[in-house]
From Swiss-Prot, chains A, B:
Protein name as it appears in the record: Histidine--tRNA ligase
Catalyzed reactions: tRNA(His) + L-histidine + ATP = L-histidyl-tRNA(His) + AMP + diphosphate + H(+)
EC nos: 6.1.1.21
InterPro entries according to UniProt: aa-tRNA-synth_II (IPR006195), aa-tRNA-synth_II/BPL/LPL (IPR045864), Anticodon-bd (IPR004154), Anticodon-bd_dom_sf (IPR036621), His-tRNA-ligase (IPR015807), HisRS-like_core (IPR041715), HisRS/HisZ (IPR004516), HisRS_anticodon (IPR033656)
HAMAP family listed in its UniProt record: His_tRNA_synth (MF_00127)
Gene Ontology terms for molecular function: ATP binding; histidine-tRNA ligase activity
Any one GO biological process: histidyl-tRNA aminoacylation
One GO cellular component, as annotated: cytoplasm
Organism annotation: Bacteroides fragilis (strain YCH46)
Similarity field: Belongs to the class-II aminoacyl-tRNA synthetase family.
Length: 454, 454
């Protein structure tokens, strides 16, 4: 008795319709990356554990999928070690490879390994799956795709500008209305400097973020509870209440941060990015948002995140500037800036708003009904001509009942069906049926091609 | 001191140029699959080991990459079992998941799991990597892509015909001249039947294959050495010496196999496939080749393989008809037929024959030289218009030395460079340089777009 097959938890099969939608997402992102001169690379699914371990924190190390060594993976391990049953320690003996956890560390490894072949600035994109042994839950998977673009080897803020243009263009093409949030790590550092509470910056941004919900008094109360001094809270007031246009916000920040060189640098960078983008004219809103504080340890300059306006969902794209991507692999001084589109969340948003263009999801355009060997042979001739003209077409391979064949066309959403019986054959034509309108007309091969390619 | 990073043996990084070439291959195959009504699916990289084990023979089981269970993978294992150090047995306790070894078993699992959602016949294609812990060697990798198309749930030989048309179309598009070899498992069974040596069929095809090299006498000698009776060898003579057109070969086989019902069925099937293809008109040669005997245990009807004519390399595509794909997962009676393109070998052939179309490998079409902030700001305006017109364009992000920027354009094979200095800015124009001819002309944004989109 064969076992009923299943798949590992947190993983997914993608059906033809889901794949068509996913391809639409990936192709749209890819096309825009190309418009901006980014080039694709791919790295192996497995990396050496020595490359991956220690790059994602202790928690990250635990979430790596490790691959058991081939052959006798027990060699070199003492009985005592075995009986210790120390799962983490022995994993590093049983396994020397792991599945990649993100695209950033493999990219850093790639840059270091291929430094002599790469011409900098290197504008690369990468669309590949990553794996995390996370507890699966709604919207969180153990295998999912990342779509990253990074420019490394250039400090220019034009890179930040272009990445925001890419974000704007991609979501405009999707038809998803978004707000692009932008902040700068240097501004956050500046704030910490002027209030003298460098280690409290996350607490501060979390509290500020609640202003709309809980009001100023409660925000200040929360800050005090987090151990921030009265004096510091007083200094924070203009920042908590920061409002108005981006220009107004930047003006306020210049005053508040006048004593912090780093802070002012962050304001200046943001000003350049926002001003240049204003000149270029974005289709979507871009907003300076001081509560944005993603990946503090990693980013060193501009940081950004994208929120969908019409769907309740977390950030659907994010990124920022980092200053030392490759240092951990012994190559210092490589600055970079990148973005990552969240394909799975974009998939959900497009589904919820029903924004997939019809042609993105449609496959076969024409099905020939099969009435038997002779009719099929005749149909195959027209079919070949249709395909040569670029029409995606098929013939039902078996002379099954008409009902079954028509139902196949319906399920596959095929818009046209060609019916070739004895009468049609005698006339050297096919009956072309429009499945939506129900309209039928007797056509030659050329007329059929004309009808489907117009 | 950071360790010099490497990647697991048998795996590869793909550079931008390699990726462009690989995408050209995948896109060509994908486009043709679509023309024939095939739909894409994807399955997870990891499958349950219970799904994979026992499907590829004992050797295959050893070549599976196994993924260590998360958490305490020692639980439920006795000290005695641990100390036995039985690597294979304990792997099944330490690991419950493995990386997929091919696309066929996951596809079978998919069909069984989703049988209620699938409308048959199901024409699916799948382009994904597979992993094998094989000893790496030239042209053999531990991670490589397969590009499979299968039709399941239809016995019709039209499926075989269409798969051969797909093969013909794909290689015509690549510009690779090929010979499509076709055989039929039923013909081989028939031969074994009439000579009464069912278990010797592989020995027979191997010996026949050497006819050109070693001559008839030596072939017969080899057959005798393999323990085939004198009487059987006599009966085999017309088959060993089989020659002429496909029609002539089929005529001979009809006579020789007249006592084998299965053999005659195989001849009849081959006749239908070859005759229909002749009517359709293939661009490449198709040849009935009795020495073709791939995967005997698996295939049950037509089998095929593709050989490149202008490069010395093994089969670059193969496939065939199987009758019980899903039986091992408890779903009987599903017949199917499929092909698999060998992307890595096709990559090598296209490289060797230098057949990549120029536009497939080219990325960015236009680079703006960056002379400083003001010039860059002006250039960004034209750049936006060019991109909106679909031109893949970039600006060098830093105001680096001219030589460095021009060298970037050269390395990236960018055909046009736009130079915007003070003079150009004052005229509201850009100097457009054709990198191949060296020709320069002063153009407006509109003229620039015109020059690059014509």
């Amino acid at each position: 008795m064969a076992a009923k097959p299943g798949i590992p938890k947190g993983t997914r099969d993608f059906s033809p319709v889901e794949m068509a939608k996913r391809n639409y997402i990936f192709n749209t992102i890819r096309d825009v990356y190309h418009l901006y001169g980014f080039q694709q690379i791919e790295t192996p699914s497995m990396e050496m554990l020595s490359t991956l371990m220690g790059k994602y924190g202790e928690e990250g190390d635990k979430l790596l999928f490790k691959i058991q060594n081939s052959g006798d993976y027990f060699s070199g391990i003492t009985d005592e070690e075995l009986l210790s049953r120390n799962a983490a320690k022995l994993a590093s003996k049983f396994c020397e490879k792991g599945l990649r956890y993100d695209l950033t560390v493999p990219f850093a490894r790639y840059v270091v390994m291929h430094r002599d072949e790469i011409t900098f600035p290197f504008k690369r994109y990468q669309i590949q799956p990553v794996w995390r042994a996370d507890r699966p839950q709604k919207g969180r998977y153990r295998e999912f795709y990342q779509c990253d673009a990074d420019v490394v080897g250039s400090d220019s803020l034009l890179n930040e500008v272009e990445l925001m243009q890419i974000v704007d263009t991609v979501f405009t093409r999707f038809g998803i209305r978004v707000c692009i949030k932008i902040n700068n790590r240097k501004i956050l550092t500046g704030i910490a400097e002027i209030i003298g509470e460098a280690d409290k910056i996350v607490d501060i941004t979390v509290a500020i973020d609640k202003l709309d919900k809980i009001g100023l008094d409660n925000v200040n109360k929360e800050l005090a509870e987090k151990g921030i001094s009265e004096e510091a809270i007083a200094k924070l007031q203009p920042i908590i209440l920061l409002s108005g246009t981006n220009t107004e916000k930047l003006a306020t920040l210049k005053t508040v941060l006048s004593d912090s060189e780093t802070g002012l640098k962050g304001v200046e960078e943001s000003e350049f990015i926002l001003n240049t983008l204003q000149t270029m004219g974005l289709k979507n809103e871009i907003e300076l948002d001081l509560t944005l504080a993603r990946g503090l340890n990693y980013y060193t300059g501009a940081i950004f995140e994208v929120k969908a306006l019409d769907v309740q969902i977390g950030s659907i794209t994010g990124g920022g500037r980092y200053d030392n991507l490759t240092g951990v692999f012994g190559m210092a001084g490589v600055s970079g800036v990148g973005i990552s589109f969240g394909a799975d969340r974009i998939f959900d948003v497009l589904n919820q708003l029903e924004l997939y263009p019809k042609e993105a999801v449609n496959g076969t355009q024409l099905l020939f009904i099969n009435f038997g060997e002779k009719e099929a042979a005749f149909s195959m001739g027209i079919l070949s001509k249709a395909r040569a003209a670029g029409i995606r077409a098929e013939i039902f391979p078996d002379a099954a009942k008409m009902k079954k064949q028509m139902s196949y066309a319906n399920v596959k959403n095929i818009p046209f069906v060609a019916i070739v019986g004895e009468n049609e054959m005698n006339e050297g034509k096919a009956m072309l049926k429009n499945m939506e309108s129900g309209e039928q007309q007797l056509v030659t091969a050329e007329e059929l091609i004309g009808a489907l390619t117009k």
